A protein has these predicted regions:
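Active-site-adjacent pocket scaffolds in enzyme catalytic domains
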Residues: 47-105
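Generic serine detector
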Residues: 1, 9, 20-21, 36, ...
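Terminal accessory/targeting
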Residues: 80-176
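Repeat-unit-sized solenoid/scaffold elements
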Residues: 36, 58-60, 64-69, 75, ...
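Metal-dependent polysaccharide deacetylase catalytic core of the NodB/CE4 family, i.e.
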Residues: 1-46, 56, 69-76
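Detector for Asparagine
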Residues: 4, 22, 43, 60-62, ...
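Long, contiguous hydrophobic alpha-helical segments, chiefly transmembrane helices and signal peptides
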Residues: 35-38, 59, 80, 116
């Protein structure tokens, strides 16, 4: 199904995903080995529940590249709506970045603090938040430490850090 899993209990998530997996197995005569979050929407509860269901990999809908050090349970999957977009999106390189949790970044549906760790060589980059656009940011020792007060404008908000070498890392922040 395409249920918004973030609105379900752990038991309901498991039930929904197992039912969908069984439907796929019945129709295709093959076990579903990979999972993609419906509409790209997920939170920590969804991640932990899906990880327990024995999938080989889990895909999100965050724009970005994948590398050998990518988390197999949080792989970027590019949504492409026009052929012209494909070349642009495939040009992104993987940016290894350690993001804070949603609760460390957001209070009352406002982005308050962002502390992202990446390569010490990166001194400046661009930061994007849905509905607020791109802005130039400086990093110290590969760390972006930014205090902001930006409202999450949508139910699903994307946040990206992009270097001037076209390396990209991003996260999805759900509005509560």
């Amino acid at each position: 199904s395409h249920t918004n899993l973030t609105t379900l209990s752990e038991e309901e998530i498991e039930e929904d995903v197992i039912k969908s997996s069984n439907d796929i197995k019945a129709k295709k005569k093959k076990k579903a080995e990979f999972f993609s979050y419906p509409y790209g929407e997920y939170n920590q509860k969804v991640i932990e529940t899906i990880k327990s269901l024995d999938f080989r990999a889990i895909f999100n809908q965050n724009l970005g590249a994948v590398a050998k050090e990518s988390d197999i349970y949080d792989l970027n999957r590019i949504a492409v709506s026009k052929a012209a977009e494909l070349q642009t999106k495939l040009a992104y390189e993987y940016l290894a970045a350690k993001w804070p949790t949603r609760d460390e970044m957001v209070t009352n549906n406002r982005l308050r603090r962002l502390r992202v760790k990446t390569s010490p060589e990166i001194e400046e980059a661009q930061l994007y938040l849905s509905g607020h656009g791109w802005r130039r940011v400086e990093l110290e020792g590969g760390v972006l430490d930014l205090k902001v007060d930006l409202r999450l404008k949508y139910s699903r908000n994307r946040i990206f850090l992009k270097t001037y070498d076209n390396e990209l890392s991003g996260k999805l922040i759900m509005k509560r």
